[in-house]
């Protein structure tokens, strides 16, 4: 049969992920956009935007880009190399059951996982309520007054507790005591944090080794890592008598049965909520918590959700006490924390809502009963259980049989914990089944059935909990799944995430989080691996981590990658510690000065302070560039003591600075190292490499450039890349290489989300990643071109171009019309948009970053909204609109405004359906403008009483 002459094969590639799925504008749309910007080709725009002196010469290449199906097959092949045995290792990581209604409707739901940190409260009411539930849960379980909305992991939370204790203690001591029964990774991270700050760390038995007068605080583990359940009340009283602070690392599941840290008198409680429905995932991500007494709440690190009111007086939630945080206080902040673990905290809070106090208590009781049954069988075999009282963990002396028993357990499909050279630890959880107990007994040489023993309890009677918890009605809702599903849906409908609209936040890179990238994170081969499982059970993880590290080295020009930092801020901290340890190894103990431009992100100076460095600010020029003359002067002035400089590239002003190589050369000439903040790496991938420019170390925000979703404020990943000379000083880990310097609880931070970044790289290929960078730059320049004339673009390069983001100056509107940047941001909500980054790095401005994933239609819709807002401001200037009663000042408008009594001098239609807003699928804010001052002056950080919910519904 002959082929008809009119039939032609198409070259269209339906599964070309990079160009058909990830990159928003079509080729035809790009041509239109380039004309608007003033260029004939994308390469012409890049040549005019990126200095030739920094552009990489060789293209970024690593094999053929895969389709979604091919990448998923590759991920499946890799995942199958992992062995998801039943891990009873414990040590802060436990098996748990994620209720399917939570997995499907939160963890796998883009309405939850693509949202940003809730800085704009009006469009974040759903997750703010879920986080308030989390805080209420933690306060109830710990018996303390105020809890934050999550921290990165238990070990870093412990380090934060130590730092907080030093801030608030009246004791003048410079040492911190750590219970030797704390988890080893917790002790290691505390030691890392303390060393550059000059604090001593004393590790020992608190009942024999603690001298309260010689420390500013102490941390106790409850229950201990080896299972001990102890009453710390006398020790806490002794610490208070010495004006020191008491912190307790507590397992929230155990607190359902045990006396709370607050009832013992503790000032601070920290821990992990992982076993509340969040898989172990080879170490993370998980939501840690911190709760404190009311008197010291203003020194607490991390996000804090509080209750306020909106302009109508209705209840509304917001982030409270933000003046404590790094983006405002910089090196004087309580911490460098930026990203937390919001998505995981939401899951944990919903786990509590799903089960209620009765269900949670039943789970805790069952875990304890199974542990008692296990202990009875082992005792019958002649083994002595080390802690007489325990919750879920027991430790046994087995002598020379340790290796034999551990191997026998693995043969039974069970991992046990190796403790020293002669002991074994066993920790049970809600996934432990009768068959698991029988398998463990067989590994120890027994042949029992669960029915051979009668359960009882082995908790100390004096520590049994009698106080109530989770009394708020939200934890007593109807358990029907239909109700749970609808509650989750109601909350998500109050929020604005990427599933509804572009989120053009500058310096945040809110790009597509493709479904194909997300799918593998819930596969048990990735989600059910314990971080301290034998290495031969995680070969798939190691293959993925190694390959992703190689790709990141190719992208950055560095020689080695550490995956341990589990946020961008942690990456900064780890990178600076790497530099510090490099200088110390050379004997240059005096090199402690860090030069940082005044325009830097607040985490930079906060991280430098944590690393024991003296921050010396460097001026910025009027065009936003680093003042090279001032930089040279400061480098010469501090030459002897210069440790490093921290710069962001492209700059925080959204421009490729021409002098970046000179900055690196000056720093090196004075013996310093260069830390190049990778926050803006989305403008460099495939075009320029930090390691080629002269940088020595960078962190990469995988939750920005490499597609891990922001999760409403976490999780994130901040791996660091370094040049070869810094490789020996990368973070170590007590459970892997035994080296010091750990910055996170798990060796690879939050590895269960690494499949997202890896699959992104596989599906894009080097060519696709390069194209994504170019289109990100095009999209930003297109917005800048369209808005020029209505607004001033504050900073551009010598060629008049911006990088991947642009800063729009709204300050003239305040002078001419009384319209603030806040008014513009809230009016964008009426148009169905999350506002760009407000007042950073310049007060009164908006920083816009569209990313490569947004289509021309969405960019045009945003520009239409911004231009319409400018026209509304012009109407105020011309006297056609009232200066105080107008759509900008009253934004955002709600359904209650629309259907209620209308007495405003503009129409309902103008209020609620401005240009850019969808008429059919319009997003409605659930509250009017939130009163920030009221929220901080009347701080409430737990769920309001049910009467307020009833009143709001009337």
Curated annotation (Swiss-Prot):
<feature type="modified residue" description="N6-(pyridoxal phosphate)lysine">
    <location>
        <position position="704"/>
    </location>
</feature>
<dbReference type="InterPro" id="IPR015424">
    <property type="entry name" value="PyrdxlP-dep_Trfase"/>
</dbReference>
<dbReference type="GO" id="GO:0019464">
    <property type="term" value="P:glycine decarboxylation via glycine cleavage system"/>
</dbReference>
<dbReference type="InterPro" id="IPR049316">
    <property type="entry name" value="GDC-P_C"/>
</dbReference>
<dbReference type="GO" id="GO:0005960">
    <property type="term" value="C:glycine cleavage complex"/>
</dbReference>
<dbReference type="GO" id="GO:0030170">
    <property type="term" value="F:pyridoxal phosphate binding"/>
</dbReference>
<dbReference type="GO" id="GO:0016594">
    <property type="term" value="F:glycine binding"/>
</dbReference>
<dbReference type="GO" id="GO:0005829">
    <property type="term" value="C:cytosol"/>
</dbReference>
<comment type="similarity">
    <text>Belongs to the GcvP family.</text>
</comment>
<dbReference type="Pfam" id="PF02347">
    <property type="entry name" value="GDC-P"/>
</dbReference>
<dbReference type="Pfam" id="PF21478">
    <property type="entry name" value="GcvP2_C"/>
</dbReference>
<protein>
    <recommendedName>
        <fullName>Glycine dehydrogenase (decarboxylating)</fullName>
        <ecNumber>1.4.4.2</ecNumber>
    </recommendedName>
</protein>
<dbReference type="InterPro" id="IPR015422">
    <property type="entry name" value="PyrdxlP-dep_Trfase_small"/>
</dbReference>
<comment type="function">
    <text>The glycine cleavage system catalyzes the degradation of glycine. The P protein binds the alpha-amino group of glycine through its pyridoxal phosphate cofactor; CO(2) is released and the remaining methylamine moiety is then transferred to the lipoamide cofactor of the H protein.</text>
</comment>
<dbReference type="InterPro" id="IPR049315">
    <property type="entry name" value="GDC-P_N"/>
</dbReference>
<dbReference type="InterPro" id="IPR020581">
    <property type="entry name" value="GDC_P"/>
</dbReference>
<dbReference type="InterPro" id="IPR003437">
    <property type="entry name" value="GcvP"/>
</dbReference>
<comment type="subunit">
    <text>The glycine cleavage system is composed of four proteins: P, T, L and H.</text>
</comment>
<dbReference type="InterPro" id="IPR015421">
    <property type="entry name" value="PyrdxlP-dep_Trfase_major"/>
</dbReference>
<dbReference type="GO" id="GO:0004375">
    <property type="term" value="F:glycine dehydrogenase (decarboxylating) activity"/>
</dbReference>
<keyword id="KW-0560">Oxidoreductase</keyword>
<keyword id="KW-0663">Pyridoxal phosphate</keyword>
């Amino acid at each position: 049969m002959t082929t008809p002459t009119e039939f032609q094969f198409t070259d269209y590639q339906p599964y070309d992920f990079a160009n058909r799925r990830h990159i928003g504008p079509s080729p035809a749309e790009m041509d239109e956009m380039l004309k608007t910007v003033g260029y004939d080709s994308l390469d012409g725009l890049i040549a005019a935007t990126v200095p030739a002196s920094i552009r990489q010469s060789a293209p970024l290449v690593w094999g053929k880009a895969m389709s979604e199906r091919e990448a998923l097959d590759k991920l499946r092949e890799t995942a199958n190399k992992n062995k998801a045995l039943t891990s009873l290792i414990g040590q802060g990581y436990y098996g748990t059951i994620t209720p399917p209604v939570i997995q499907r409707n939160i963890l796998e739901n883009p309405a939850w996982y693509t949202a940003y940190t809730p800085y704009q409260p009006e469009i974040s009411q759903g997750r703010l309520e879920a986080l308030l539930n989390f805080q209420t849960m933690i306060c109830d379980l710990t018996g303390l007054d105020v809890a934050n909305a999550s921290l990165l992991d238990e070990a870093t939370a412990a380090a934060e507790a130590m730092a907080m204790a030093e801030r608030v203690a009246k004791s003048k001591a410079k040492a911190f005591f750590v219970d030797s029964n704390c988890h080893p990774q917790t002790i290691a991270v505390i030691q890392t944090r303390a060393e550059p700050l000059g604090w001593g760390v004393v590790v020992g038995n608190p009942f024999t080794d603690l001298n309260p007068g010689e420390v500013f605080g102490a941390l106790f583990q409850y229950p201990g890592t080896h299972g001990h359940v102890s009453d710390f009340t006398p020790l806490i009283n002794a610490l208070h008598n010495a004006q020191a602070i008491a912190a307790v690392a507590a397992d929230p599941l155990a607190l359902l049965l045990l006396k709370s840290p607050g009832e013992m008198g503790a000032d601070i409680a920290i821990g992990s909520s992982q076993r509340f429905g969040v898989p172990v995932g080879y170490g993370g991500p998980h939501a840690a918590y911190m709760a404190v007494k009311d008197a010291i709440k203003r020194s607490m690190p991390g996000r804090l959700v509080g209750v306020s009111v909106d302009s109508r007086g209705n209840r509304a939630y917001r982030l409270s006490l933000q003046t404590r945080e790094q983006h405002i206080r910089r090196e004087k902040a309580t911490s460098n924390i930026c990203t937390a673990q919001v998505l995981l905290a939401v899951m944990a809070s919903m786990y509590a809502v799903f089960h209620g106090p009765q269900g949670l208590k039943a789970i805790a009781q069952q875990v304890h009963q199974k542990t008692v049954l296990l202990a009875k069988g082992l005792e019958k075999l002649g083994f002595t259980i080390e802690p007489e009282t325990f919750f879920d963990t027991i430790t046994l002396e087995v002598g020379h049989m340790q290796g034999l028993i551990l191997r026998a357990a693995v043969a039974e499909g069970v991992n046990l914990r190796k403790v020293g050279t002669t002991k074994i630890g066993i920790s049970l959880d809600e996934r432990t089944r009768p068959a698991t107990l029988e398998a463990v007994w067989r590994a120890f040489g027994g042949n029992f059935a669960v029915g051979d023993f009668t359960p009882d309890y082995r908790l100390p009677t004096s520590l049994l909990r009698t106080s109530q918890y989770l009394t708020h009605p939200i934890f007593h809702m109807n358990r029907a799944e239909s109700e749970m599903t609808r509650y989750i849906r109601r909350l998500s409908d109050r929020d604005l995430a990427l599933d509804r609209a572009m989120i053009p936040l500058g310096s945040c890179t809110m790009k597509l989080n493709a479904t194909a990238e997300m799918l593998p994170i819930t596969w048990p081969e990735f989600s059910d691996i314990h971080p301290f499982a034998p290495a031969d059970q995680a070969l798939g993880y190691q293959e993925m981590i190694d390959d992703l590290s190689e790709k990141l080295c190719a992208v950055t020009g560095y020689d080695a990658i550490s995956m341990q930092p589990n946020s961008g801020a942690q990456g900064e901290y780890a990178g600076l510690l790497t530099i510090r340890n490099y200088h110390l190894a050379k004997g240059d103990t005096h090199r402690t000065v860090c030069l940082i431009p005044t325009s830097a992100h607040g985490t930079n100076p906060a991280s430098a302070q944590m690393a024991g460095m003296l921050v010396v600010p460097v001026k910025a020029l009027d065009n936003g560039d680093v003042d090279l003359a001032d930089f040279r002067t400061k480098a010469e002035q501090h030459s002897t003591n210069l440790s490093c400089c921290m710069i962001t590239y492209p700059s925080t002003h959204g421009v490729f600075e021409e002098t970046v190589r000179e900055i690196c050369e000056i720093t090196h000439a004075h013996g310093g190292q260069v830390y190049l903040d990778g926050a803006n790496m989305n403008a460099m991938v495939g075009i320029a490499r930090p390691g080629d420019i002269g940088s020595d170390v960078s962190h990469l925000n995988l939750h920005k450039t490499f597609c891990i979703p922001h999760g409403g404020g976490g999780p994130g990943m901040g791996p660091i890349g370094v040049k070869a000379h810094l490789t020996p000083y990368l973070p170590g880990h007590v459970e892997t290489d035994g080296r010091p310097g750990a910055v996170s609880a798990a060796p690879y931070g939050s590895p269960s989300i690494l499949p997202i970044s890896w699959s992104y790289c596989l599906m894009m290929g080097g060519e696709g990643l390069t194209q994504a960078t170019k289109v990100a730059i095009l999209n930003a320049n297109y917005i800048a071109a369209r808005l020029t004339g209505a607004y001033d673009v504050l900073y551009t390069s010598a060629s008049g171009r911006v990088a991947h983001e642009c800063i729009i100056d709204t300050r003239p509107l305040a002078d001419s019309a009384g319209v603030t940047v806040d008014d513009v941001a809230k009016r964008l909500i009426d148009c169905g948009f999350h506002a760009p980054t407000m007042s950073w790095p310049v007060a009164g401005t908006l920083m816009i970053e569209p990313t490569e994933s947004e289509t021309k239609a969405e960019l045009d819709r945003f520009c239409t909204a911004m231009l319409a807002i400018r026209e509304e401001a012009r109407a105020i200037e011309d006297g056609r609109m009232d200066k105080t009663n107008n759509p900008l000042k009253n934004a955002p408008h709600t359904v209650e405004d629309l259907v209620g009594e209308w007495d405003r001098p503009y129409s309902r239609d103008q209020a609620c359906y401005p240009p850019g807003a969808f008429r059919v699928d319009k997003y409605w804010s659930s509250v009017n403008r939130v009163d920030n001052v009221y929220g901080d002056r009347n701080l409430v950080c737990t769920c309001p009483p049910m009467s307020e919910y009833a009143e709001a519904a009337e």
